[in-house]
Regions:
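Conserved sequence/active-site signature of Rossmann-fold short-chain dehydrogenase/reductase
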Residues: 2, 41, 87-89, 133, ...
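A conserved pocket-lining segment of Rossmann-fold NAD(P)-dependent short-chain dehydrogenase/reductase
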Residues: 7, 85-94, 102-128
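Conserved beta-loop-beta element that borders a ligand/cofactor-binding pocket
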Residues: 33, 37-38, 69-92
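C-terminal substrate-binding subdomain of Rossmann-fold SDR/epimerase-dehydratase oxidoreductases
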Residues: 113-168
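Active-site helix of classical SDR
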Residues: 64
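Conserved Rossmann-fold NAD(P)-dependent oxidoreductase catalytic core, especially the SDR/UDP-sugar
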Residues: 20-60, 80
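NAD(P)H-binding glycine-rich loop region in Rossmannoid oxidoreductase-like domains
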Residues: 1-17
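Hydrophobic positions on the long internal alpha-helix
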Residues: 21, 25-29, 71-72, 136, ...
Length: 168
């Protein structure tokens, strides 16, 4: 399951999907695994974070992804983990638009209502286009790269994001 709202609907199914399926994979597959995790494993922290920053997940989604990472790291599999930022953009004709993400919410409101409301706005979002994930991951399919890597293109406040949308 992806995202806080979807995971909160059915915690048991979330754990089965995000944690137990990874455990089953590592127990039955001896090959290399490239795993998409999330920057949400860090929780709410100040300052610039890197891959060695302490984790502190604040949601079931983030907890389940971190637990899956730990299973992968303790397995004998060769594992490459990408901690993805907040994804945006349509990837293909089968993708669904996530209307729970701030970028999409603000854009939809700007288009349909002609205005956006931002409360606070100081929260940061590590944005990442879905095609940038593919650009980063594809070269690693045929390598032996391992480890954990944060993957995002821009860390922007919600207010800055609203201003960018407004300027378009």
């Amino acid at each position: 399951f992806v995202g806080d709202p979807a995971c909160a609907i059915n915690p048991k199914l979330t754990r089965q999907t995000n944690v137990e399926s990874v455990r089953n994979l590592t127990n039955s597959f001896g090959g290399r695994i490239i795993f998409p995790s999330t920057c949400s494993v860090y929780g709410a922290q100040d300052g610039i974070l890197d891959e060695d920053s302490p984790t502190g997940p604040l949601s079931l989604y983030a907890e389940s992804k971190l637990e899956a990472e730990q299973i992968l790291k303790s397995s004998t599999n060769s594992t490459l983990i990408f901690r993805l930022g907040t994804l945006f953009g349509m990837s293909d004709q089968f993708a669904r638009l996530r209307v729970d993400l701030v970028l999409n919410v603000l854009t939809i409101r700007a288009i349909l209502e002609g205005s956006m409301s931002v409360f606070g706005g100081a929260q940061y979002r590590p944005l990442l286009h879905v095609r940038d994930v593919a650009t980063a991951a594809i070269p690693h399919i045929s390598t032996n790269s391992t480890g954990i890597y944060n993957l995002h293109t821009e860390n922007i406040t919600v207010l800055e994001l609203a201003e960018k949308i407004r300027s378009v």
